Amino acid sequence: SGASSVPGLGDLPMTWETAQAQDIGVLERQLGRPMRGVHAIAARCACGDPAVVVTVPRVEDGTPFPTLYYLSLPEATKEASRLEAAGLMLDFEQRLADDSRARSAYEAAHKDYLHKRDELGSVPEIEGISAGGMPTRVKCLHALIAHSLAEGPGVNPVGDWALAESGWSLEVCRCRVDE
């Protein structure tokens, strides 16, 4: 694994790994459906299973797909859903409203997201649309957590806050607890 080059797309960022056939199989089991638009794996669980998949901005059938980083790991998606159900999105929006530095960082995260997605292809239908409500709202913690896991701490403050609130970590595998 490691960084690689894809014809026409240039070098993958250092944290992205080319998705292998085994990864696609794991992703399909994780998500319960056939995969579309898989470009790379941006983050992995401690056991090696994909945690965040990088998707192309236009999938095979021509549909625009704005979600660059898609959270796939079941324990992570459960935790994001739990945080959303607990109402943390409103709390995080208030934190952004109260903290100009966090708000600026969130706007920068939005721009980073758009830049990375645009490197995979221009899709006019979704131009300026990132994910998770960026740059002004907090709508989907799954997308924001995925961004933080893919890029590391300090890029997306809301994703970082959600990870801190969750107590969940890629460093502790819970993938096979129920097997």
Regions found by a protein language model. Give the residues of each.
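Preference for intrinsically disordered or flexible, low-complexity segments
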Residues: 9-179
